[in-house]
Amino acid sequence: MLDMGDRKEVKMIPKSSFSINSLMPEAVQNDNHPQPHHHHHHQQQPQHLQLPQQHHLQPHHRPLQEEDELDKSLLEVKTESLPPGKGDPAASELPGEDKDKIDDKKVDGKDGDSGKDGGDKKNGKYEKPPFSYNALIMMAIRQSPEKRLTLNGIYEFIMKNFPYYRENKQGWQNSIRHNLSLNKCFVKVPRHYDDPGKGNYWMLDPSSDDVFIGGTTGKLRRRSTTSRAKLAFKRGARLTSTGLTFMDRAGSLYWPMSPFLSLHHPRASSTLSYNGTTSAYPSQPMPYSSVLTQNSLGNNHSFSTSNGLSVDRLVNGEIPYATHHLTAAALAASVPCGLPVPCSGTYSLNPCSVNLLAGQTGYFFPHVPHPSITSQSSTSMAARAASSSTSPQAPSTLPCESLRPALPSFTTGLSGGLSDYFTHQNQGSSSNSLIH
């Protein structure tokens, strides 16, 4: 209460005692220190706290000192409330070079990570790449050396090349699995039992060769019809070349028959070649029984059709598969290799093809020699045996007695039709040394 009364008495003092000379020392101090810093303000605060002590010591100068210190305290409050760039005189007096240095430090301190990551990282996070999940899968499979990848291999490729998916591992892996199973461009290939590891492989479907990744949308797109036709033409030429080699390899695995002569002749129509002549294929398939009956081998070398096993039945496919091939081998064994087979029309059977067919009989009859006879008027089988011994492609000839006990044991495991064929040949043609 005493303080309030003292303050009221101070306000009631007449202002006639106020003089300009009392303000002169403060003006001089302001000229010496035109812009005080924060440190001076902090040093003047204890003087503001000592006002009650000076109030009792110097009663005549109380109003002047109190008003000046109140103004200074108001200035301090205003400067502290304002941001440092505007109200702080120390900050406003910084030269332009210092401001540039401060800005550079801020960029290097916080935003400098974006320069290290190639501009993909903004505000501490990577941007999502503008590619669909199908495009990411296709990129991963196409860059692999074997053009196939497992599911983990696809994950590793995406996380290695796109850091966004390395930081955000939730959700996108399920999307990758769904796109692999739903999109027809991707085919699942089972792992081979010799291949170590887990999981199936994923490959691109051959029909997806014309699929590319759009540059603007990042989605899969197909090429136009013209470019697609060119790709189909190239793909067809490639498949035909590989298909021929595959059929050649497959044919050598199942049946060592020469591809130049087949029992089932292709039913191709007669076409003109480039020089205007007709092709070697007839318009109607010619049965091989007629081919064999046109040669002049004699009655001993002609096949009988009364024994139930004729060449017509061979061609028509009425004989089982194993009997068919074995009979074909026996058929070739009984035909002289060097014999030309004349045929009517434009169809002619090359003797080389007959030689190739006869050479295949070693597959079933390894002990049977392959004769090489050039004369059609040969009458004795001894001359044939002598000529076959001089043939370069025939193996070493064995005596006829060594062949006789081997044939019954071989024919016992054959079907009824072929065994009848061998017994008929043994009974009917006694001069044929190839069978008995």
From Swiss-Prot:
Which residue ranges hold the DNA-binding region? 128-222
Q: Name one GO cellular component term.
A: nucleus
Tissue expression pattern: At late gastrula and early neurula stages, expressed in a narrow stripe at the anterior end of the neural plate. At later stages, this stripe of expression thickens and expression also appears in the lateral margin of the neural plate. The anterior line differentiates to show expression in the forebrain, anterior (nasal) retina and olfactory placode, whereas the lateral cells form neural crest cells that migrate in the first branchial arch. In tailbud stages and tadpoles, expressed primarily in the neuroepithelial cells of the telencephalon.
Give positions of region: Disordered: 1-63, 79-129, 375-402
Q: Where is the composition biased (Low complexity)?
A: 44-56, 375-397
Extract the PROSITE patterns matched here: FORK_HEAD_1, FORK_HEAD_2, FORK_HEAD_3
Q: Which example biological process does GO assign this protein?
A: negative regulation of cell population proliferation
Question: Where does the record place Basic and acidic residues bias?
Answer: 1-12, 96-128
The compartments listed are:
Nucleus
An example Gene Ontology molecular-function term? sequence-specific double-stranded DNA binding
Cross-referenced Pfam families: Forkhead (PF00250)
The alphabetical list of record keywords is:
Activator, Developmental protein, Differentiation, DNA-binding, Neurogenesis, Nucleus, Repressor, Transcription, Transcription regulation
PANTHER family for the chain: FORKHEAD BOX PROTEIN G1 (PTHR46617:SF3)
The record's function comment reads: A neural-specific transcription factor that can act as both a transcriptional activator and a transcriptional repressor. Both represses and activates neuronal differentiation in a dose-dependent manner, independently regulating cell fate choice and cell proliferation. Converts ectoderm to a neural fate. Suppresses the transcription of the cell cycle inhibitor p27xic1 and promotes the proliferation of neuroectodermal cells at a high concentration. Promotes the transcription of p27xic1 and inhibits ectodermal proliferation at low concentrations.
Name of the protein in its database record: Forkhead box protein G1
Source species = Xenopus laevis (African clawed frog)
Q: What is the lineage of its organism?
A: Eukaryota, Metazoa, Chordata, Craniata, Vertebrata
| Gene of this entry | foxg1
